[in-house]
Amino acid sequence: MIRTMMNAKIHRARVTESNLNYVGSITIDSDILEAVDILPNEKVAIVNNNNGARFETYVIAGERGSGKICLNGAASRLVEVGDVVIIMTYAQLNEEEIQNHAPKVAVMNEDNVIIEMIHEKENTIVL
């Protein structure tokens, strides 16, 4: 059986920009992407903690060290600058792969700096 499991999470990032007139996507600081192994053009699910919106888009790599989290195109209507978001990817794994799967989670501070990396083996509560 193949199951869809969380693979990576950027937890509690803050939206730094919103650009309605861009073609679409989310731009994320390349350093953050590398820390959690998210690739440019990869599909991501986004949850806005401020208004409850949930949506999907794809990733564009942003400038390293910028802390940039910019929602582009139609997705920009679902956020405001300063909103706290959770950005996730998923992987389809078989039962054997699941046994050794440890998602990478980057916990962010208010400046979009990683303050903790969690390599989840089991369910972990992050406040």
From Swiss-Prot:
Catalytic activity: L-aspartate + H(+) = beta-alanine + CO2
Recorded GO CC terms: cytosol
Subunit structure: Heterooctamer of four alpha and four beta subunits.
Function, in words: Catalyzes the pyruvoyl-dependent decarboxylation of aspartate to produce beta-alanine.
Family: Belongs to the PanD family.
Cofactor requirements of the protein: pyruvate
Protein name, as recorded: Aspartate 1-decarboxylase
Keywords: Autocatalytic cleavage, Cytoplasm, Decarboxylase, Lyase, Pantothenate biosynthesis, Pyruvate, Schiff base, Zymogen
Cofactor note text: Binds 1 pyruvoyl group covalently per subunit.
Active site positions: 25, 58
Example GO BP: pantothenate biosynthetic process
Gene name, Swiss-Prot/TrEMBL: panD
Post-translational modifications reported in the UniProt record: Is synthesized initially as an inactive proenzyme, which is activated by self-cleavage at a specific serine bond to produce a beta-subunit with a hydroxyl group at its C-terminus and an alpha-subunit with a pyruvoyl group at its N-terminus.
Binding site for substrate: 57, 73-75
InterPro entries assigned to the protein according to its UniProt record, in alphabetical order: Asp_de-COase-like_dom_sf, Asp_decarbox
Modified residues (Pyruvic acid (Ser)): 25
Taxonomic placement: Bacteria, Bacillati, Bacillota, Bacilli, Bacillales
Molecular function terms, GO-annotated: aspartate 1-decarboxylase activity
Major subcellular site: cytoplasm
Enzyme class: lyase
EC code: 4.1.1.11
Pathway listed: Cofactor biosynthesis; (R)-pantothenate biosynthesis; beta-alanine from L-aspartate: step 1/1
Top-level taxon in the UniProt lineage: Bacteria
Annotated compartments: Cytoplasm
